[in-house]
Each structure stands twice: as structure tokens, then as C-alpha cells.
Amino acid sequence: MREIVSLQAGQCGNQIGTKFWEVVSEEHGIDGTGQYTGTSDLQLERINVYYNETGTGKYVPRAVLVDLKPGTMDVIQGGPLGGLFRPDNFVFGQSGAGNNWAKGHYTEGAELVDQVLDVVRKEAEGTDCLQGFQLTHSLGGGTGSGMGTLLVSKIREEFPDRMMATFSVVPSPKVSDTVVEPYNAVLSVHQLVENSDETFCIDNEALYDICFRTLKLSAPTHGDLNGLVSIVMSGITTCLRFPGQLNSDLRKLAVNMVPFPRLHFFTVGFAPLTARGSSQYRAVTVAELTAQMFDAKNMMAASDPRHGRYLTVAAYFRGKVSMKEVEDQMVSIQQKNSQYFVEWIPNNVQSAHCEVAPRGLKMSVTFIGNNTSIQELFKRVGDHFDVMFRRRAFLHWYTGEGMDEMEFSEASANMHDLIAEYTQYQEAGVDDEEEVAYEEEPQE
């Protein structure tokens, strides 16, 4: 079976990751101690993608939990899922990264990384046929961004032919935690462009907007935001965890979604999202789901898909859904909004189906789009980066850990290149494709 090893780095990564395990364990009928209490054979059919079954019949997540300070780990171990994870898989330092990317990537994190890789190796050896890794982390802090990207590059070296998917929480000015977030984010994107195969961009600002506007929560907490993220993560991984007609794994997803290796940053969405009180007043139909999932207000990254074009789209429907209806809806959406899809990739909308609906819903859909408007998100972070870097503000924290200014300039340049590539393909028509291919050949 095609197993996935899951990594969580830093406070944000661990909180989102643990919420994800909460949702997935519930869907598979596994309680807080790892015992199976479910009712359906479907729950067990592909359970070993994410869980390891011990000799005593206990199911243990293939998860490695990493942080540079023990606080978050203590909370997880004391929480409802404390007995689920393997105790050896908690790897933590004592010092913290102090929201400093350099500490996570070069000093504190580098000291801990071998210990983490040992645990990762152990998990990888316990699999039949490892398909890849998924990392949950944020790009704004120190541990998730610095040490998270360090882990990605180390795992890349050791398992070059395995897939690497990341769920990355991008910082946003409205929900800012620290002033150096733009530095940490740009340095991380620089790494992810090279080393990740698929990155699902999640954005605190967009999550807040969804909580305010759609879910009508007056004061959203981080718990609400993490809940949204975990719903999406559960949806994206549905096809990996349950049998379905389009039984995708991470590699098939990448083949369908990534037309050029650097352009692997996806916008994700979920439908139906309704406020707690008003759900009983709405009928959920396939038409409504498709409309809501393409709606800009439903995107979990603060970039407006109407400002760009879709290179590729994948939609995962769950529950009792007629596939014919889904296909018809998808075709009609593409015909009505043809200007939002690039015409030089035919059939660029894939839909898959899984019969197991999420808890409390009859049907739902998870949306993954590779849209050129994701550049807005990078532009936003890049602009904040430039404003600070121009004045060399806060740089001594990074150079003090042994970093060089050149590294900042390189990361910034790489991000600007990425933005330029997205713009280029957004504007490319069918006829320009030959010229584009010609330009890309290396000049001697």
C-alpha cells in the first residue's frame, strides 16, 4: 500500500496537524487511544496509508512531531489525542527559534535535524511502499518556516524519488504575529520552489474572512481557523485514504496539477460552508457545490481567482453524488467561464469521487486549483519584504546566526522570478506556446 509519512513542524504546524489527525481518526473510526471503533469496512480498507497497525491491533499515526520548544508538544500529549501518537515520534528542543528563520534553518534547527531524520527513517522503513511525505507548517514563524524547509531539503536528499507535499500557512498583515514574517516567508518560499512537489497555500487572512463572512463568527479563534484547515486537508487526502474510482496518490495529483515544475503552489477551497444556524434552510445540490467551490470567497488563500487564470483544477466530491451530474456541472462551468481557464491545456479540470462523506454532511467537495492569481499572495509578501529589506531592518538577527545578505537578495529574486513566470503563463495564448518553449532553452 502507498503510505504517507506526515511531519508537523513548529507551533502552527503541530496545532493544524493535530487537528487533522483528530478529523482523520474520527473518519476512520479510531479513538484517542488508537483502538478501532468504526462500523464500515471502507474505513479500514486503506487505513495503512496514514496509520501503522501494531501487534496488539492499535493504530498509530505515521506522524513525526517537531518543535524547537516543548510547549506545544506538552499540550498535545496532555490533550485528547495524547495517547494516539508514538511517544518516540515527538522530537523537540528547549530553546525555541524566536520567530527567526535563521535559527530554525541554520543553528538551533540544524542541531535537532538529525534526530528528526532518524525518526523519519524509522517511519519510512516501517512502510511497504512509501509514496511520500506531507509537512504542515507556517511560513511566518521560525521553526515551521526555517526548520520545516530544512527538513524538506534533507528528506529530498535522502528520498529523491518520493513526493513531497506541504500545507503551508502564509502570513498575512491582518493576522500578523511578528514583524519579521515577510523575511521568514520569502526565505521559505525560496526553498519550497526548489524542493516541494506540491504546496497547498493556506492564508490566515482568507480563513478569517471565511469565518466572518460565511460562517458568521464574530470573533474567530485559532481553533476555528485550524478547524477549516483540517477540513480541507481531510478533503485533499480523501482520495488517498478511501477507495474511490479515481484512486489518486500524491504523484497522480502532481501529474494532473503541475504543468511546469516551479508552478506548484495551489489554492484550496471547500464547500458547503454555511453558518451554524442556517444550514437547515439550504438544499445542497451538485450545482450549488460547484458554484460555491469556484467562488472567490471560498478560497483559503487571499488571492482572487478572477484576477488570474486556472492552469489546472482538481475537485474531490464526497458522499452520494451522481458522477454524471458532476461532469455536466464541470463542463458547464468551464464553458460559461472559459476566459478563466488557459486554453492551451485541454481537459484541465479533473474530478474525483469518494463515497464516504465527512461527518455531519451528506455531500461535500474539496477544491484544488493551480491559478496564476496566487502571485498576488507572493506579491503581497514580497512588497512587505522589500520595504523592510531596503532599510536592512531587523537583519542583524539573521546575520547574527551566520546568514549573509546575499541569501536575502537571492530569495527575493527567486520569488520575483516565480511571479514573472505566473504572469507569463497567465497571458500566454495557444499561439505563443512555441515561442515560450523556445525562450526557455538555456543560452550557452
Swiss-Prot record:
Belongs to the tubulin family. Tubulin is the major constituent of microtubules, a cylinder consisting of laterally associated linear protofilaments composed of alpha- and beta-tubulin heterodimers. Microtubules grow by the addition of GTP-tubulin dimers to the microtubule end, where a stabilizing cap forms. Below the cap, tubulin dimers are in GDP-bound state, owing to GTPase activity of alpha-tubulin. Keywords: Cytoplasm, Cytoskeleton, GTP-binding, Microtubule, Nucleotide-binding. GO terms for molecular function: GTP binding; GTPase activity; structural constituent of cytoskeleton. Changing residue 54 to A: In strain: 22000, A128 and Nine. It holds the Pfam family Tubulin_C. One of its GO terms (cellular component) is microtubule. This is Tubulin beta chain. Changing residue 69 to E: In strain: 22000, A128 and Nine. GO terms for biological process: microtubule-based process. Dimer of alpha and beta chains. A typical microtubule is a hollow water-filled tube with an outer diameter of 25 nm and an inner diameter of 15 nM. Alpha-beta heterodimers associate head-to-tail to form protofilaments running lengthwise along the microtubule wall with the beta-tubulin subunit facing the microtubule plus end conferring a structural polarity. Microtubules usually have 13 protofilaments but different protofilament numbers can be found in some organisms and specialized cells. It is found in: Cytoplasm, Cytoskeleton. Its main location: cytoplasm. GTP binds at residues 11, 138, 142-144, 204, 226.
